[in-house]
Amino acid sequence: MLRLLLRHHFHCLLLCAVWATPCLASPWSTLTANQNPSPPWSKLTYSKPHDAATFYCPFLYPSPPRSPLQFSGFQQVSTGPECRNETLYLLYNREGQTLVERSSTWVKKVIWYLSGRNQTILQRMPQTASKPSDGNVQISVEDAKIFGAHMVPKQTKLLRFVVNDGTRYQMCVMKLESWAHVFRDYSVSFQVRLTFTEANNQTYTFCTHPNLIV
């Protein structure tokens, strides 16, 4: 029995070696692509995004999580029975490459980030915060809804730095906290707090009372 199986396996390999193009390409004969001779895969451009997603569907495995900052755009593709009617995502990175991904936790995070990054209200927030004003900005109800859908209610960032004063130095910690909230009347509140502490929580140090600009 083992000899028969090996013989059958060798026969299949021989057929695919002789008829390589039909064996490998026949399931994807409907795929149409515009490509130069032997291009790297990242330069392959498909005439239709659906064709690209359908081609890669059977080979898709979850990719390791990636930062949303690596990507410049995305496209959502609905597939048919060949992909079990799944929704796939084409993620475009800044090097001109395209990732074809199924829905996952990190992919949803990337989509959430990209779909809100170019919204007008989210671009105005840092511009307003960097300019002296009375703190009141007029926004529309639609802007408030977009802000509420994409905002992070509370975020904390820590930065360690060293203050050096001659022969003495202190290890300091800068803590940046931001809060965002959308009220029922669609008014928006956005606050930022900056605090400085010493790494070992000493009370009076260069970190909290510096005598030089860092």
From Swiss-Prot:
InterPro entries: Herpes_UL130_cytomegalovirus. Keywords: Host-virus interaction, Membrane, Viral attachment to host cell, Viral attachment to host entry receptor, Virion, Virus entry into host cell. It is found in: Virion membrane. It holds the Pfam family Gp_UL130. One of its GO terms (biological process) is symbiont entry into host cell. One of its GO terms (cellular component) is membrane. Belongs to the HHV-5 UL130 protein family. Plays a role in viral entry into host cells. Forms a pentameric complex at the surface of the viral envelope together with gH, gL, UL130 and UL131. This complex is required for entry in epithelial, endothelial and myeloid host cells. Mechanistically, engages host receptor(s) including neurophilin 2/NRP2 to mediate infection. Forms the envelope pentamer complex (PC) composed of gH, gL, UL128, UL130, and UL131A. The pentamer interacts with host NRP2. This is Uncharacterized protein UL130. It comes from Human cytomegalovirus (strain AD169) (HHV-5). The lineage of its organism: Viruses, Duplodnaviria, Heunggongvirae, Peploviricota, Herviviricetes. The gene is UL130.
